[in-house]
Regions:
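A structural boundary/capping signal
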Residues: 2-265
């Protein structure tokens, strides 16, 4: 063990909370070397050290989740399911990533007998499970959090389309997400489109100048921006910092100093 880390760990037992906070700050600067050491200490019999070790681990987990989401937001065409899980974990930070992924895999398994490899069968399955699109004027964070959407079968138009697109891809059906007059739909290679908002209706494609195509990164950035807006509306400094920080990094902004006070402090 690094001597500096060893000496700092001994100081975690300090009765003075302010001193302990300074020690924690110093330890966090040595993140790459901490994991193994902290695992050994997390069940120590010393309650003060145990509490502070758990605090450090929580901070490290938050940092890593934020870094992972920032990376996904910066990719040219990000992996959509992983990105949505990472975004969910920013808003519901007490949830576990494996639990959210289980909701996704359970959803996939439930579709197997429906053979969702064409628009008709895909639409039938989504109607069967009761998947609906939330009204456009209802801006609720739950509609943009993958785990909640998979539990409630209701979500924002773009997220419902994202879920449908990823499900279809697993069955060999390649769909593109498009926006027509503000509403989202899924476009198939044969020129048909599936419209979740209209009860999973299948329709003919509009002209090329009538729609905008959205890629994975655009969808993830929009969902992150909506959650950031929800955080500002509810004055939630914690989420403003975490989600806002991830978005800022995609614009090469290391901090949120461009925001008005008090969010830039």
């Amino acid at each position: 063990m690094n001597n500096d880390i060893e000496n700092l760990l001994k100081l975690l037992d300090d009765d003075n909370q302010q001193s302990a906070n300074l020690v924690i700050a110093e330890l966090l600067k040595r993140e790459p070397e901490l994991d193994t050491v902290l695992q050994k200490l997390q069940e120590t019999e010393n309650p003060k050290i145990r509490k502070r070790v758990h605090q450090i681990q929580s901070i490290l987990t938050t940092r890593r989740r934020r870094k992972s989401l920032a990376h996904s937001l910066a990719l040219k065409n990000t992996e959509l399911v992983n990105g949505c899980v990472e975004l969910h974990m920013q808003w519901y930070d007490n949830d576990s990533e494996p639990a959210v992924m289980r909701l996704w895999t359970d959803f996939i398994k439930s579709s197997e007998k429906y053979h969702t490899d064409n628009l008709e069968r895909l639409a039938r399955f989504m109607r069967k499970v009761g998947f609906t699109v939330a009204p456009r004027d209802e801006v609720e964070p739950d509609y943009y959090c993958l785990g909640i959407v998979l539990e409630e079968f209701t979500g924002a138009d773009p997220l419902v389309c994202a879920i449908t697109k990823e499900l279809a891809a697993l069955r060999g059906l390649s769909l593109r997400i498009i926006q027509i007059m503000g509403d989202f739909a899924l476009m198939a290679p044969d020129g048909k489109m599936l419209i979740p908002k209209n009860g999973w209706k299948i329709a003919e494609m509009p002209g090329a100048d009538e729609y905008i195509e959205w890629d994975n990164t655009m969808l993830l950035k929009m969902a992150a921006s909506i959650l950031f807006l929800c955080a500002v509306n509810t004055d939630s400094f914690r989420y403003i910092h975490t989600i806002g920080g991830c978005i800022a990094k995609t614009a090469c902004k290391p901090t949120l100093e461009f925001l008005p006070y008090p969010y830039n402090s």
